[in-house]
């Protein structure tokens, strides 16, 4: 009996040592992570924050997003699997004072595994009194293809909508970590963070954009990575990519891309 007690005491002490050692290792790992975050520059933090979504690019089949989960926080209701919002828009000025803006928004609901949205066509005027002309054409995604739900008599526009591809479907940011010497802007009060890079026309993403869109300027674009909200992640804020080819008046040319994961709206999912 005395022998059994000694064995039990030995095992208790051993487990206690392992537990304390484990806690020590966990604390060491936490300290290492905290130290890494402290030593990372804001530029590195911005790139790491974007990498959480950009590492998924190219998303050739958008329906794969039904099986992917983004950043979750207390804004999500119990049982809500979340919704991905994806947007690609292209704006170009062909004459001073007017900006032609077209693109698509799609909401991919992971609860229902349904994706609906719209294609938008808009003219943005310097004279804001004229800015009431946006047209929206309802669409849905089926078998990774855009299906037009509204009647569109313009055959050219109809074809453009049905063949539309989001930037995230062909963009590749595998070398994002190699982007260097960005122009960094931060506002901790908002909070917001921005990294801007001068790209080269030989960049594969830039070349692809020139193939798809009527980009007439030969200027190499600036790439802007913009975060609104907590740099570590937030379902309230958002992240946006922007390629600006020209800022000249009457020649403004911009591609913007947005992929965000957030709570599903208007549903009882509990």
UniProtKB/Swiss-Prot annotation:
The family classification in the record reads:
Belongs to the staphylococcal tandem lipoprotein family.
Q: Which domain of life is it from?
A: Bacteria
* Main subcellular location: membrane
Positions with an attached lipid (N-palmitoyl cysteine) read 23
Against PROSITE patterns, the record matches this protein to:
PROKAR_LIPOPROTEIN
Q: Which GO terms describe its cellular component?
A: plasma membrane
Q: Which residues form the signal peptide?
A: 1-22
Keywords attached to this Swiss-Prot or TrEMBL record, sorted alphabetically, are: Cell membrane, Lipoprotein, Membrane, Palmitate, Signal
- Name of the protein described by the UniProt record: Uncharacterized lipoprotein SAOUHSC_00405
Per the record, lipidation of type S-diacylglycerol cysteine is found at 23
Q: Where in the cell is it found?
A: Cell membrane
């Amino acid at each position: 009996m005395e022998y059994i007690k000694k064995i039990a005491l030995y095992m208790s002490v051993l487990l206690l040592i392992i537990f304390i050692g484990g806690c020590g290792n966990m604390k060491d790992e936490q300290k290492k992570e905290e130290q890494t975050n402290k030593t990372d520059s804001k530029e590195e933090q911005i790139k790491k924050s974007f990498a959480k979504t950009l590492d998924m690019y190219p998303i050739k089949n958008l329906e794969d997003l039904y099986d992917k989960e983004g950043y979750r926080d207390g804004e999500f209701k119990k049982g809500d699997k979340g919704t991905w919002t994806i947007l690609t828009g292209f704006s170009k000025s062909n004459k001073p004072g007017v900006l032609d803006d077209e693109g698509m928004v799609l909401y991919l609901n992971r609860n229902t595994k349904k994706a609906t949205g719209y294609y938008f066509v808009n003219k943005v005027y310097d004279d804001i009194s004229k800015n009431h002309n946006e047209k929206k054409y309802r669409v849905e995604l089926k078998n990774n293809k855009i299906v037009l739900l509204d009647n569109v008599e313009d055959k050219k526009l109809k074809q453009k909508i049905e063949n539309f591809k989001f930037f995230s479907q062909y963009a590749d940011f595998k070398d994002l970590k190699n982007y260097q010497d960005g122009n960094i802007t931060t506002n901790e009060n908002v909070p917001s963070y921005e990294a801007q890079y001068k790209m080269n026309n030989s960049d594969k993403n830039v070349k692809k954009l020139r193939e798809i869109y009527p980009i007439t300027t030969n200027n190499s674009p600036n790439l802007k990575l913009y975060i609104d909200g907590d740099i570590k992640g937030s379902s309230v804020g958002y992240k946006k990519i922007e390629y600006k080819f020209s800022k000249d008046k009457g020649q403004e040319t911009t591609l913007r891309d947005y992929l965000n994961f957030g709570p599903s709206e208007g549903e009882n999912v509990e």
